Amino acid sequence: MARTRFLQGLDDLRARLLRMGGLAEQAVDRACQAYIDRDLTRCRMVLEGETQINITEREIDELAFDLLAMQQPMAVDLRFILAVTKINADLERVGDQAVNIAERVMDMVDLPKADLPVDIPRMAAAVSAMVRRALESFIEGKAELAQAVLEMDNVVDRMKDEAFIVLVKSMNEHPETTRQALDALLVARNLERVADHATNIAEDVIFWVRGADVRHNVAPEPPVQHEVTESH
């Protein structure tokens, strides 16, 4: 009976994290579109959604701690619970970055538009794809999907570095659009941080599935078990 309740708790934990992931992904998408369209309605939706993200984060942590206290989990279950708590924290921070972008848009909405030499929508699309792929790797329990996210992070890092170079140059050559260029640079930095959190999520999925710590560029160990295909 205790094992059955524990397994039900794992299912509930997984479902709650998927909901959290959906909220965070939605927040990023709305914030990015708000920046592209200067859409205050979407900005407000991001800010209002932060409360639910924070509530869900606390609920997940409480459930995870309850499950750890319920019984001594088997290795794969313990890794799952630990991964969920870490992914949960990263998703909350993804939501924070979405709020930062939304607040930036609200500050800049009255400024005249400037033709800046940077493709923020392209970077936003790449970052959104990273978040989506990281969540898919968790849903499917596939370490190879998570590994693809780690590779995508290099692309986003290059985009951010390129944005910094061209925007600083733009500020020097066109001081009248310095404020707009600075806003774009800050948004690019927010997007890079979202990508970093997506990378963390992918690393946690690899830890759960393979029992391998791939943080800090440590080469992954050979899988210690088959890819996880069950719900936990």
Language-model region placement:
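Cytosolic, long alpha-helical scaffolding segments
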Residues: 1-232
